[in-house]
């Protein structure tokens, strides 16, 4: 029911060749800064990001939901492709968002066991969740460009994109915003520096500055899950009575409920739930709206986080800037003739 797929190794020589060809092509442009990141993404394939070795967990849709989430925890992964044995193909992804949706949909009280989580199979949950709406799996070929991958991630508002070999039907890797930005950062020092890198978030209007979803220390966990479901955000800054950020509760933190087997009591506060973090937490990573895009990119990549909380001098929350915001700005907004795709 749970299996690991071997991933193919990428050829480092081919990556170097692609990059040299990309740099060579820049010398023939009247303005070497023009569309630099867009052209970089168009000159590299998804295959170039497939590591020599990585863990890929695949679930059969006949697996029990509870076992699947426990398997995510034990394997240290955030999502898994779903294989339908009847159709003999991949049909979707199981993510932490599914776990949140199940908990929020079926939770009643600490005294009532969540039967649907305990007994439902993945295929049963998909039938309930999707109902009559058909949502095909969004995937990409290893030979497709990284530009196509970024476009697909942003267009479909997804965080994980399976790279599937069209010949074998095997899933080779799961592409994410983080992995793509990290790959770009490897080469960014060798590329021309566009002027917009020296502009601030405020000047470029990058990030979300209005209707920021936040929670307080005493917010019930069930209410926080409701915000995740209704507003489709991936993290909630935890603020004090003055609006100052004191912590952050992300979708990834919710999986700790499975790890600790504490998902039957969602009446506890967000603060109480955060005490169950499985990893060391160094604090909320923040930035200011007057910091440059270059500084923001460096901080995101070096800290390996998905977002920064934008604060003012008093640490009051003013916005959020995410990896998807950055890729949108680098590759699409400032990449295609200054137009947003």
What are these regions (language model features)?
Residues 1-341:
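Tandem CBS (Cystathionine beta-synthase) repeat/Bateman regulatory domains
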């Amino acid at each position: 029911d749970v299996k690991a797929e071997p991933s193919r190794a990428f050829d480092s020589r081919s990556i170097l060749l692609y990059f040299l060809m990309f740099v060579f092509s820049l010398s023939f442009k009247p303005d070497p800064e023009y569309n630099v990141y867009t052209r970089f993404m168009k000159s590299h394939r998804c295959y170039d990001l497939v590591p020599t070795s990585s863990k890929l967990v695949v679930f059969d849709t006949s697996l029990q939901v509870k076992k699947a989430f426990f398997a995510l925890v034990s394997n240290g992964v955030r999502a898994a492709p779903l294989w339908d044995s009847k159709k003999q193909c991949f049909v979707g992804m199981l993510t932490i968002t599914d776990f949140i949706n199940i908990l929020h949909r079926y939770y009643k009280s600490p005294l009532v066991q969540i039967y649907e989580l305990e007994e439902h199979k993945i295929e049963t949950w998909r039938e309930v969740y999707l109902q009559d709406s058909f949502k095909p799996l969004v995937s990409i070929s290893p030979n497709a460009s990284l530009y196509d991958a970024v476009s697909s991630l942003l267009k479909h508002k997804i965080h994980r994109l399976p790279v599937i070999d069209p010949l074998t039907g095997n899933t080779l890797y799961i592409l994410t915003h983080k992995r793509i930005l990290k790959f770009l950062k490897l080469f960014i020092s060798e590329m021309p520096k566009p002027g917009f890198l020296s502009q601030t978030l405020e000047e470029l209007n990058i990030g979300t500055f209005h209707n920021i979803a936040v929670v307080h220390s005493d917010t019930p966990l069930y209410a926080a899950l409701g915000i995740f479901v209704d507003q489709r955000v991936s993290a909630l800054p935890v603020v004090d009575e003055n609006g100052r950020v004191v912590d952050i509760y992300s979708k990834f933190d919710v999986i700790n409920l499975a790890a600790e087997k504490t998902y039957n009591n969602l009446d506890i506060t967000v603060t109480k739930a955060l005490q169950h973090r499985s990893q060391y937490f160094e604090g909320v990573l923040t930035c200011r709206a007057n910091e440059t895009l270059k500084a923001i990119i460096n901080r995101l990549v070096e800290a390996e986080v998905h977002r920064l909380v934008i604060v003012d001098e008093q640490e009051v929350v003013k916005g959020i800037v995410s990896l998807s915001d950055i890729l949108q700005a680098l590759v699409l907004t400032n990449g295609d003739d200054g137009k947003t795709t």
